[in-house]
Amino acid sequence: MPTVNQLVRFGRQSVKKKSAAPALQGNPQKRGVCVVVRTTTPKKPNSALRKIARVRLTNGIEVTAYIPGIGHNLQEHSVVLVRGGRVKDLPGVRYKIIRGALDAAGVANRKQARSRYGAKKPKK
C-alpha cells in the first residue's frame, strides 16, 4: 500500500479502457471495400444464415462486418461504410455495415426503425 507521500509524488495509475472496435482507430465510421460476401451460422442455441462481409478498410485492416436487415445488394468490390457494434451470436463479428450509405442500399418495405436501415419514408 502506498504512503501519502508516494501518492502525492506519483499518483494512481489509471486503467486504460480497451476499444470495442479497434480497427476504426477512434473514428465513428470507416469506408471499406467488400472482399467476400457470404453467410454463416450463429452459435448455439440460435439457428439461421447470417449475412456477413469481409471488408478491407481504408486503413488497410480487414474486418468481418454484419449486414443488417432483410435482403441486401452487396457483392465483391462494393464500397461500404462500417461502424462499430458486435453481433452477439456471431463470434468474431465486431462491426456492422451501415445500410443506405455508399453502395449498400436501404432495406425495402421497412416501416419501423427506418433510420437504422436507410429506408425512405413510405408514400401515403
From Swiss-Prot:
CDD domains according to UniProt: Ribosomal_S12
InterPro entries: NA-bd_OB-fold, Ribosomal_uS12, Ribosomal_uS12_bac
Key words of the record: Methylation, Ribonucleoprotein, Ribosomal protein, RNA-binding, rRNA-binding, tRNA-binding
Pfam families the UniProt entry points to: Ribosom_S12_S23
GO cellular component: small ribosomal subunit
Molecular function in Gene Ontology: rRNA binding; structural constituent of ribosome; tRNA binding
Highest rank taxon of the organism: Bacteria
Residue numbers carrying 3-methylthioaspartic acid: 89
Annotated SUPFAM superfamilies: Nucleic acid-binding proteins
GO biological process, one term: translation
Subunit-structure text: Part of the 30S ribosomal subunit. Contacts proteins S8 and S17. May interact with IF1 in the 30S initiation complex.
Function: With S4 and S5 plays an important role in translational accuracy. Interacts with and stabilizes bases of the 16S rRNA that are involved in tRNA selection in the A site and with the mRNA backbone. Located at the interface of the 30S and 50S subunits, it traverses the body of the 30S subunit contacting proteins on the other side and probably holding the rRNA structure together. The combined cluster of proteins S8, S12 and S17 appears to hold together the shoulder and platform of the 30S subunit.
Family note: Belongs to the universal ribosomal protein uS12 family.
Name listed for the protein in its UniProt record: Small ribosomal subunit protein uS12
High-level lineage: Bacteria, Bacillati, Bacillota, Clostridia, Thermoanaerobacterales
